[in-house]
Amino acid sequence: MAVRLSKCLLLASIALLYTLIVFNNTTDYNTNYQFVRHVLQMDTTLPGNHGLWRAIHSPAIHIVFYLFIILWEAVTAVLCWWATLRMLRALSATAANFDHAKQLGIAALTLGMLLWFGAFIVIGGEWFLMWQSHLWNGQGAALNNFAILGIVLLYLNLPDTATAR
């Protein structure tokens, strides 16, 4: 039961994290929008950069990117909360039923990992060369979040071997 509860609490912590991220991105919209804008414009990358042809200068596209990120984070938060509730309801269930209840959490964590790795590290970091910016480099934060979600995903994905008590 302790392992099951541990998995629920860790997933709830991820849900809270995403809830706070969405809260911060909406209540401090401009600060976080500036991050997205500068990454897409590539205006703080290294001088002489030959990849600047990739830069996007359209404010409308910057807004679409940013709103898409917020939406992705909000969906991840909702799915994590929903999965946490499903798992809590299955705390006393059979191992098979508890494992089944974890599936939505596995999907939610995967969705979160795709944002940090796919959007921030791959697209932001490599396509828009975010790693070259001293001011707008979010690669470290993205890697931290990707790693945290990955560890929780691995732990959550372990099969439940305890019998219900």
Feature map (PLM): residue ranges:
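Membrane-interface interhelical connector segments
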Residues: N30-I61
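Extended, low-polarity transmembrane helix blocks
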Residues: M1-N24, F65-L67, L71, V75-R165
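Helix-to-loop transition at the C-terminal end of transmembrane segments
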Residues: F23-T31
